[in-house]
Amino acid sequence: MLVLGIESSCDETGVALYDTERGLRAHCLHTQMAMHAEYGGVVPELASRDHIRRLVPLTEGCLAQAGASYGDIDAVAFTQGPGLGGALLAGSSYANALALALDKPVIPVHHLEGHLLSPLLAEEKPDFPFVALLVSGGHTQIMAVRGIGDYALLGESVDDAAGEAFDKTAKLLGLLYPGGAKLSELAESGRFEAFVFPRPMIHSDDLQMSFSGLKTAVLTAVEKVRAENGADDIPEQTRNDICRAFQDAVVDVLAAKVKKALLQTGFRTVVVAGGVGANRKLRETFGNMTVQIPTPKGKPKHPSEKVSVFFPPTAYCTDNGAMIAFAGAMHLGKGREVGAFNVRPRWPLSEIVR
């Protein structure tokens, strides 16, 4: 069965073809990054219009790449939410119209479920169950995943998502949009503990997270540096040091919370998905992750246990059609009919009912 996947939740237009027998056949992506850069962020109206312009050419490009035709498509999957309303409508309308024209079923997909399952597109796939860390510009959540459609929310950010905190901090440092990736790049040249920022909620017993206070700590440090230098410009090395300290703080919090989730669930496999999953420091830290089961005081300590950690291929960390095509394929025959204008800009993953 050949499933066409369509992603249009924000500022990437993604189209892909997934074959249930042969795997991913084609993957085409257009990013609107350059278009939004001059505005310092995503402009929803511009995003929607660009999706409309790109969907047909990208679909035809995928078909050519796979050596297939419209008649070979067996189902059309699309992102129903969450995301920008207008952007979602562009993809939904196109998917429903195409499915109607081809007389094929349409499968609505939750955007975060697409991210959650994206590591299954890799050659080395995780086995269920696992703890999933969904970490992006819009969401930071820890989930217990026991199978396709069986997801339980364990904890999440109570304010800014980690990716959002990266972008906002980058802006404080004068980095151009999208600044999160640039911040990570500059952090590579930062000195260890030249600055030390707080790790919000790292010691709380629950799995909730918070990153807005960390952003405020960076602002305080930046203002202090500017006052000391008597200028608005931040010295290059100092900026790099701040980037390093900020990134280390975020990664430390994420790692600590995921370890707690592993102890809570008893799982020993972690899946990291979402745009921040491409961060090199995050991959390095999680790649060396171990957990140690707590022991009563005075008793011998349990040996540390190695954790199996899986990331999607880097190309599938950001929004893409491949993850939507794959998630749709996993739900073939379970889809529900939806109208072309029935999108869900706000849609908690916990509300998925299969």
Curated annotation (Swiss-Prot):
The keyword Acyltransferase applies. It holds the Pfam family TsaD. Its cofactor is Fe(2+). It catalyses: L-threonylcarbamoyladenylate + adenosine(37) in tRNA = N(6)-L-threonylcarbamoyladenosine(37) in tRNA + AMP + H(+). GO terms for cellular component: cytoplasm. It is found in: Cytoplasm. Coiled coil: none annotated. Required for the formation of a threonylcarbamoyl group on adenosine at position 37 (t(6)A37) in tRNAs that read codons beginning with adenine. Is involved in the transfer of the threonylcarbamoyl moiety of threonylcarbamoyl-AMP (TC-AMP) to the N6 group of A37, together with TsaE and TsaB. TsaD likely plays a direct catalytic role in this reaction. The keyword Lipid metabolism does not apply. Its EC number is 2.3.1.234. Belongs to the KAE1 / TsaD family. GO terms for biological process: tRNA threonylcarbamoyladenosine modification. InterPro entries: ATPase_NBD, Gcp-like_dom, KAE1/TsaD, TsaD. The gene is tsaD. It comes from Neisseria meningitidis serogroup B (strain ATCC BAA-335 / MC58). It comes from the Bacteria. This is tRNA N6-adenosine threonylcarbamoyltransferase. Fe cation binds at residues 111, 115, 319. Binds 1 Fe(2+) ion per subunit. Substrate binds at residues 134-138, 167, 180, 279. Gene3D superfamilies: 3.30.420.40. Keywords: Acyltransferase, Cytoplasm, Iron, Metal-binding, Transferase, tRNA processing. One of its GO terms (molecular function) is iron ion binding.
